[in-house]
């Protein structure tokens, strides 16, 4: 990503459950990083209930490698990664080409 988004760290169950639900919009420089205890397909699945806009979603494993990505549509109820992931990065839909499957990333505390 050339201009990385400022993603909010979201580790608690309630934070992950709520996600971006009921937000009116998301700017290109905002995001949410859902953090789970281990790599898992089931645990890292997401829902789009109450989300009013499309998202670029990246699933990232414990080795910080992107293992799947999708444009999540506001009208579809749920998405699951094809591979186990520990992190789910939700950002503006226009950023779907910012990361490639297989790419290794790093998190920066700002």
Predicted regions span which residues?
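Compact, glycine-rich, soluble single-domain proteins
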Residues: 1-110
